[in-house]
A protein has these predicted regions:
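Long, contiguous domain-sized segments
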Residues: 1-148
Length: 148
């Protein structure tokens, strides 16, 4: 379990209606209107036994200017971090840690792969390069079909 202490999950596609505010209303509008390089407040997700009784801190950050993206949610990433210590599980993450994680994610947004992939606005460069490498190792559709 301690191996996940410094692991952060980043989602390029997500359902914005799942994040609720204090009044249990959808935060989708707040997420869509995020200014460039701003983040939402983090919230604690407690999935229960199904997920090993591990809580998560979840927040959203805009990494691309909205006027250059195809949809209101393009250019926004969902960030998740497992809350590993008892203090974190009880109180959540400190804002300073969330800000540091967010700043590091923002720093990984360049260079841009614009035009190479329809999801370009949500790419983090190291992840994009890893995906490209992995895909380059796949057999082409024609080669795969000819195996049968």
């Amino acid at each position: 379990r301690n191996n996940y202490r410094h692991v952060v999950g980043v989602s390029k596609r997500f359902n914005p209606n799942l994040m609720k505010d204090n009044k249990n209303q959808s935060s989708a509008g707040q997420i869509a209107k995020l200014p460039l390089f701003h983040r939402t407040p983090a919230f604690m997700w407690k999935p229960g036994e199904e997920w090993g009784n591990v809580n998560f801190a979840i927040w959203y950050v805009r990494i691309r200017e909205r006027k250059y993206t195809a949809t209101p949610y393009s250019g926004i990433l969902k960030i998740e971090k497992m809350l590993m210590t008892g203090k974190e599980a009880e109180n959540g993450l400190e804002s300073d840690e969330i800000d540091m994680i967010t700043a590091n994610i923002i720093n990984e947004r360049n260079p841009v792969c614009y035009g190479n992939d329809a999801r370009w606005a949500n790419h983090l460069y190291p992840v994009y390069m890893t995906e490209c490498y992995c895909k380059s190792r796949f057999k082409s559709d024609i080669s795969f079909i000819n195996l049968f």
